[in-house]
Amino acid sequence: MQKLAELYRGKAKTVYTTEDPDLLVLEFRNDTSAGDGARIEQFDRKGMVNNKFNHFIMSKLEEAGIPTQMVSLLSDNEVLVKKLEMVPVECVVRNRAAGSLVKRLGIEEGIELNPPLFDLFLKNDAMHDPMVNESYCKTFGWVSEENLARMKELSYKANDVLSKLFGDAGLILVDFKLEFGLFNGEVVLGDEFSPDGSRLWDKETLNKMDKDRFRQSLGGLIEAYEEVAHRIGVKLD
């Protein structure tokens, strides 16, 4: 499938149209950003690692009965995906306290959250992705109650699948972000799942193995991503 015109350029991915109006090409770049794009750096191999990581995870979720936009792996840094009508709200599942939750509530980083928390954020970089809730979604018409309920159901199902996958590899799935869209009226998981949009800690050392290494200037970003990929069985080379 040949990519045609650039449709959208995000912080780390570029989206292209194809000759099929229902299919797009996602290109994963080497860019890494923090602070809503205020800080951007390039890391060799990052686009390839995230692309293959995402394809692997989406395949696992499909096997578990979670519909995703994934069609096929095209190259080291490109995948073919279904064109979704994206919901402007993203879902976050939290198994342990970290990131904005710690800042917002003043709680200790790393405490277990049982049952896991489910948060919603409006996708708006200019407004720093403000936190919203179900009533906002209904009032502003961002997503129907039925589709939002399905998004929540699929987010928790993904959490069950991925917590076990990472847990078996000696990793803690601390939290993660999911984005959904509609394809022929069905709620489908879109965007990506990678260490860019999740927090993953080593079970033994609690070392951070995700984009917090970049956000907090810890170094070793790609080495951490590749280590996580290796542990869960992603074939990179």
From Swiss-Prot:
GO biological process: 'de novo' IMP biosynthetic process; cobalamin biosynthetic process
Catalytic reaction(s) noted: 5-amino-1-(5-phospho-D-ribosyl)imidazole-4-carboxylate + L-aspartate + ATP = (2S)-2-[5-amino-1-(5-phospho-beta-D-ribosyl)imidazole-4-carboxamido]succinate + ADP + phosphate + 2 H(+)
CDD domains found in the cross-reference section: SAICAR_synt_PurC
MF term (GO), any: phosphoribosylaminoimidazolesuccinocarboxamide synthase activity
Enzyme class: ligase
Pfam families assigned to the protein according to its UniProt record, in alphabetical order: SAICAR_synt
Biological pathway: Purine metabolism; IMP biosynthesis via de novo pathway; 5-amino-1-(5-phospho-D-ribosyl)imidazole-4-carboxamide from 5-amino-1-(5-phospho-D-ribosyl)imidazole-4-carboxylate: step 1/2
Transmembrane stretches, start-end: none
Key words of the record: ATP-binding, Ligase, Nucleotide-binding, Purine biosynthesis
EC annotation from Swiss-Prot or TrEMBL: 6.3.2.6
GO cellular component: cytosol
Family according to the record: Belongs to the SAICAR synthetase family.
Family annotation (PANTHER family): MULTIFUNCTIONAL PROTEIN ADE2, SI:DKEY-6E2.2
Record protein name field: Phosphoribosylaminoimidazole-succinocarboxamide synthase
Source organism of this protein record: Pectobacterium atrosepticum (strain SCRI 1043 / ATCC BAA-672) (Erwinia carotovora subsp. atroseptica)
